Amino acid sequence: GERLSEADLDALVDMLASLHRAFVGFQDDGLFTNRAMRELNHQHIFRVPLDASNGLDLDALTPGLSGAATKLREDTDFVAAVETLGRVYLRDGGTLLHGDFFPGSWLRTAEGPRIIDPEFCFLGAPEFDVGVLVAHLLLADQPPAIVDRALTGYAERIGTRPDEASRALVMRFAGVEMMRRLIGVAQLPLTASLARKRTWLRQVREMVSSAARQTRSSGGGG
């Protein structure tokens, strides 16, 4: 994908961190619960991609992709880890999230990036927003240094120390977002071969399952 400049990345991370900081501990009166939207998105993010009867012909998109999807769907540990993440996503939190922080919600302007689509906002786990950002950096083949810059820059702007459990949760959410963009109905205009998509799906399995094991061993997670 097109390389994201460090300046644009920093601006995106700054906007996300500013949103999260501004509403830490916010006492919601129901305005930002956004339950109906969140439940709809939960289906599309965590359930539909793993449902073989979702009506999506993956082989029409990329011949052979349905077989790769079946292998992922038959991995019971992976499916269980995704279900656990889905429960974390639905759990009310104390941070206002954008809720759909991917390139389709970013506008490039002469004054720098701008963010749209606030209708997805809800109070939840901030790692979800960061995970979505990381997922799309990976799907755009951004270099590892850009991903590290995003994660480090976010932590610095939030003012938190490095937290292995939080980082693991970010990567788990990133893996699920990649999965739903590869084998779910919310497809991206990716010009990628079957081999490339298989590689991404192997990465997805590792990100979700290994990060889940890491979280359990450290005593964190949902």
Predicted features and spans:
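ATP-binding pocket architecture of kinase catalytic cores
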Residues: 1-32
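Short runs of predominantly hydrophobic/aromatic residues within well-ordered alpha helices
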Residues: 9-12, 16, 127-130, 171-179, ...
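A general structural signal marking secondary-structure boundaries and capping sites
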Residues: 20-27, 158, 186, 211
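Active-site catalytic-loop/activation-segment of kinase and kinase-like phosphoryl-transfer enzymes
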Residues: 30-86, 183
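Active-site acidic catalytic loop and adjacent metal/ATP-binding pocket
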Residues: 81-128
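Active-site activation/catalytic loop segments of kinase-like enzymes and analogous catalytic loops
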Residues: 127-159, 174-193
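ATP/Mg2+ or Mg2+-diphosphate-binding catalytic cores
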Residues: 145, 175-222
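Acidic, serine/threonine- and proline-rich low-complexity regulatory regions
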Residues: 159-169
